[in-house]
Curated annotation (Swiss-Prot):
One of its GO terms (molecular function) is exodeoxyribonuclease VII activity. This is Exodeoxyribonuclease 7 large subunit. One of its GO terms (biological process) is DNA catabolic process. Belongs to the XseA family. It comes from Chlorobaculum tepidum (strain ATCC 49652 / DSM 12025 / NBRC 103806 / TLS). The keyword Cytoplasm applies.
Amino acid sequence: MIKTAQSVGELTRAIKNELESLFPFVRVKGELSNVKQHSSGHVYLTLKDSEAQIPAVIWKSVRARSPLELRDGLEVIAEGRLEVWPPAGRYQLICTALFETGEGEQRLALERLIAKLAKAGWFDAERKKPIPRIPRRIGMITSPTGAVIRDMSDVFARRFPAAELLLYPVQVQGERAVESIVRALRYFNDPPKPEHKPDVLIVARGGGSSEDLQAFNDEAVAEAIYRSAIPVISAVGHETDLSVADMVADLRAGTPSIAAERAVPDREELLRLIDNLVNRQSILMEGLISGAQLQVDSITSSYAFNRPVQMLGQFEERLALMEKEMKRAIAEKVRDREQQLTAAADRLAMLDINRTLKRGFALVTQDDRYVTSAKSLEADAKIGLTFHDGQREARVTE
């Protein structure tokens, strides 16, 4: 008995459906060859290694997003999906992203780290600590110079000058950045003095390239944030940047300025809240007085108490005294809170490092580290001096 045969088209369609469903996404490493830029804007090429080769296509829209200069011999990591092209009876790779080998491997390492931490539950919302509504002290982990510290200080001064600011200066990029950031997080969690322990921490840096932000994708920094007993707000780069530190932190802010806004309440809003509370107390007090007055009127109009007028006088005196005392207590609370806010604003102004530098002080650095003791400097050592209006270099003499 002769079985019914499939047509070439039927078999090819079956292969196409099976293959494309099995490989909706692939990531493959290889060498480019036969790179051809078509007039349509599409790029046709072959991805190969010592054992095999795969034809590949990069559509015009994908090519426009890639900064790579495609050339024969370039080692790349390609991402995409497999597709069967029936007219030629072959399969090809439809590329959705292309990375040079070094960049691609770094991306893969980052993806593996994110997958590892996600599996460990480090990103889970259930483990994230709430940010205190009214923090007394705020620890800032960032560079001591530049726009970040100025922007955050301006926000704190405007919104909530009562907060005490604690700065741990760190390197935010470079070889020592990871060690510096981890050391700062550990310091604030176990400071030598109780008054150095903040209620909330902000880890921040300005925008930059992916290489500049690399320290905030390091597992050691992620672990230090995860282990922190103090709530951590992460503000790394711009709103479009997302680092591992952002994902582990208890709260992610798009920019350092936004982090400062999320860390503290608005002073004007607090004052409005106080005014509302005062008004509510006043209304409550007036209601109590009105109720008491009605009782007094009822009593004085009754036959039994119509004669002892002196009792009515006593009630009125007590009511007047109660009203006076309640108004005085409310006024004192409002006055005390205003004095606290004013004092806090003065303390915040005193913490401004530029103000200190203008009084004749300078920051001393050696090899990008802050010098805190004369004993640590040897003769003829090269040092950096940061003044309020610029920087100079100097050498140490005996």
